[in-house]
């Protein structure tokens, strides 16, 4: 959702600390998901919550009983009265954002990322890891709450000032061949994912589709 990116960077400008919460991936796990969200809201001392239409009801239910100032959809925030405020001057040791671990072996743990750490990491990725140039273009289907999705495909393209195209994670899960179709269409040079993503895509590709793909520009995978 593009609103996530707008709100994430708005928090940076305003001196607020954004925390990306995980999306529900299990069917029929409503209660467990809401309970997890509530624990994350409490652990992060969240005061304001924003969610797109598909997840807003979960977030509002999870926030019940908590002293949060506002939990609503992006449209509600955009409708708030405009007020001129001086921008916060970020310092290197200020907190940039909090990243929660996947929680595959235990409850997700919050990792505090400071601006100094974030910028050093981005410099290393852009200049040395990916060796990026102005001719690069990125493409991703990874969720923004995932470290690889947030750092690799939200922060990196902004830091490097290059274009990026996004495919909704759910769309990829249902039709993984779209990844290759969009790589062909956009001529993207950089797109990477966990190994299961390549496996899922390879298992869904049909022999008759192969001739329609042109991945010759894809240099980092």
Explain the meaning of each model-derived region.
Residues 80-107, 117, 121, 129-137:
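Conserved pre-ATP/AMP-binding loop-to-beta segment of ANL
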Residues 1-9, 26-35, 87-90, 113-116:
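Conserved AMP-binding/adenylate-forming core of the ANL superfamily
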Residues 6, 13-81, 194-195, 200:
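Structural core segment of the AMP-binding/adenylate-forming
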Residues 1-13, 31-32, 142-160, 177:
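Conserved coil-to-alpha-helix start sites within the AMP-binding
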Residues 49-58, 171, 188-221:
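Adenylate-forming
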């Amino acid at each position: 959702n593009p609103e996530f990116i707008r709100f994430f960077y708005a928090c940076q400008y305003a001196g607020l600390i954004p925390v990306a919460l995980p999306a529900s991936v299990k069917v029929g796990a409503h209660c467990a998901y809401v309970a997890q969200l509530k624990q994350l809201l409490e652990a992060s001392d969240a005061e304001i919550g924003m969610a797109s239409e598909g997840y807003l009801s979960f977030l509002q239910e999870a926030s019940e009983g908590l002293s949060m100032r506002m939990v609503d959809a992006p449209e509600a925030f955009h409708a708030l009265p405009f007020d001129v405020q001086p921008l916060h001057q970020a310092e290197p040791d200020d907190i940039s954002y909090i990243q929660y671990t996947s929680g595959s072996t235990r409850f997700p743990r919050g990792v505090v990322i400071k601006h100094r750490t974030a910028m050093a990491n981005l410099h290393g990725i852009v200049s040395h890891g990916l060796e990026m140039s102005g001719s690069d273009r990125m493409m991703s289907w990874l969720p923004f709450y995932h470290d690889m999705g947030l750092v690799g495909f939200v922060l990196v393209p902004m830091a490097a000032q290059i274009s990026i195209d996004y495919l909704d994670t759910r769309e990829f899960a249902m039709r993984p061949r779209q990844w290759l179709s969009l790589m062909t269409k956009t001529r993207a040079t950089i797109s990477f994912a966990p190994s299961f993503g390549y496996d899922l895509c390879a298992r869904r590709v049909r022999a008759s589709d192969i001739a329609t793909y042109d991945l010759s520009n894809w240099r980092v995978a």
